[in-house]
Design a protein with these regions (language model features):
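Hydrophobic (often cysteine-bearing) scaffold residues that line and stabilize catalytic clefts
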Residues: 12, 77, 158-165, 196, ...
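ATP-dependent adenylate-handling ligase core
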Residues: 215-273, 298-309, 328-331, 352-363, ...
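Adenosyl-5′-phosphate
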Residues: 1-4, 278-285, 291, 304-466
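Amphipathic, well-packed alpha-helical segments that form the structural scaffold of globular domains
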Residues: 166, 170, 174, 201, ...
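Short, motif-level signal for alpha-helix interfacial/capping segments enriched in acidic residues
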Residues: 38, 79, 266, 314, ...
Length: 466
């Protein structure tokens, strides 16, 4: 985990210092600033990690994510946001899925960029998200180098598909366990998080698993069962409703969003990651499993011919919703999240697996979501966890509609009608979202440029006023 900032103009070291201070939580172990011909770059990083910068006759670079060190080989679908200065030109690149965050804006017509929006607010105008799968060169502008698109399924038998998926996931997890004796894994007791925890356990001496929820939440029960089954060192955070209200301002500040469904999940993610930081510097997180293997309920309503395209679209939407949540929760506490379902080898295989293996039904039975993933790990997990239906993070943790109910006590119908129109002309969906937006503006002001705020597909909403 690290954080980068920069500007495509010389003589701006003081500005870069100011921007780095806004994202200092992303790296408390070290800081470097490079003022070169063509611009100024800055990076903060965690203690103990390999410093994420290079400075040699071939060029200067700072990055967040995984980088080989070769600027000519920077195009990747592994986590990476990189900025480099070479020959007086600034080069920027973001990974193909948007796992590592990057944003940009303008200062007097000059490009400025940062890992988080908060470093740009008050500095830049026209703040936008740097698009995943793009690179930028100051002399030529933006250019797309990667885009995930629907592909033809490979002619795989069920057993072969399950075996290949198991191997790909084992290798994806091993990338992060290699050389370690201890690592963490978020564990909700659902299929995705349980899979990563079970795969990681034999690869390390000590696996710490982390679950959180309100007393009696189903996630806690399922997570305990899985933790006992795989023999992990299990930790729990049990919270009450006041804890949710109290943590909201911090969550929204780090998340940089007011999207209601995203914040619901982010609260529980934030609380569990706080616990991670007490034990290990990094933990696996199960994002990507639902999008790759058809885990969401609405997929069952789609025509089979449309399902593959919607799965690809779902993966391409993750950069400013689920992946943003994972990154901000981890960075808030100086930890790192490993999303092994989105490892390049896993994604490449998954998009070629026939969709009928993902939503699979026997005879006239209801289709089972993520069926091929369940088959790939059926020997690893207890039966209850293996066949547990999909539950949203905030539902399984016991949050359910408590946040929406709380918002109704804070915001009147008249308030909602008067305040739901945003400065950019769009509308807030619910009173819950207005509650979050009010907190958002307390942190960041009444921004007119809100293009960087991702919105969850299928979020509940009321009709827009005429």
């Amino acid at each position: 985990m690290s954080g980068i900032v920069g500007i495509c103009r010389t003589g701006e070291k003081q500005l870069v210092e100011k921007m780095l201070a806004k994202i200092s939580h992303r790296g408390t172990g070290g800081k470097r600033i490079f003022a070169k011909k063509g611009g100024v770059l800055g990076v903060v990083y965690q203690k103990g990690e390999k410093p994420p910068f290079l400075n040699n006759p071939r060029g200067t670079a700072v990055w967040d994510g995984r980088f080989s060190g070769d600027l000519d080989q920077a195009e990747t679908d592994s986590p990476l946001a990189l900025a480099a200065l070479k020959g007086g030109e600034v080069f920027l690149i973001r990974d193909g899925l948007g796992i590592s965050p990057l944003y940009y804006g303008e200062v007097d017509g000059t490009l400025v960029f940062a890992s988080e929006v908060k470093a740009l607010i008050g500095v830049a105008s026209k703040i936008q998200e740097f698009p995943p799968g793009y690179k930028y060169l100051s002399g030529t502008g933006f250019q797309q180098y990667f885009g995930l698109k629907p592909v033809e399924a490979w002619p795989l038998e069920q057993e072969e598909a399950a075996l290949r998926l198991r191997r790909a996931l084992e290798e994806a997890v091993a990338q992060y366990t290699a050389g370690r004796t201890e690592i963490g894994s978020l564990l909700s007791g659902g299929l995705d998080s349980s899979t990563l925890a079970a795969l990681a356990r034999p690869q390390v001496d000590r696996l710490h698993t982390f679950a959180c929820g309100m007393e009696g939440a189903s996630d806690l029960e399922y997570a305990r069962e899985v933790a006992d089954h795989i023999d992990s060192i299990h930790h729990e955070a049990i919270y009450a409703l006041p804890d949710l209200w109290n943590v909201l301002p911090d969550v929204i500040y780090h998340l940089e969003s007011f999207d209601a469904l995203l914040i619901r999940s982010a609260i529980t993610h934030y609380l569990v990651t706080k616990m991670v930081a007490d034990y290990v510097p990094a933990a696996f997180s199960g994002e990507g499993g639902d999008e790759l293997f058809a885990g969401y309920a609405y997929y069952k309503d789609l025509d089979p011919d449309d399902l593959n395209g919607e799965l690809i679209a779902s993966i391409n939407r993750m950069h400013n919703t689920a992946l943003q949540r994972v990154d901000r929760a981890a960075s808030a506490y100086g930890t790192e999240a490993y999303v092994s379902f989105l490892a390049p080898s896993v994604v490449k295989l998954a998009v070629h697996i026939p969709v009928e293996y993902k939503l699979h039904a026997e005879a006239d039975e209801e289709p089972v979501e993520k069926w091929i993933l369940r088959k790939a790990v059926e020997d690893l997990l207890p039966e209850q966890a293996l066949w547990r239906p999909k539950v949203k993070f905030w539902e399984g943790a016991g949050v359910e509609d408590h946040l929406a109910d709380y918002a109704k006590t804070q915001i009147t119908d008249a308030d909602f009608r008067q305040e739901r129109r945003l400065p950019d002309g769009s509308f807030l969906n619910t009173k819950e979202e207005l509650l979050y937006y009010r907190i958002f503006t307390e942190h960041f002001g009444n921004l007119t440029d809100l293009d960087f705020v991702g919105r969850t597909k299928g979020a509940p909403k009321v009709p827009e006023p005429l």
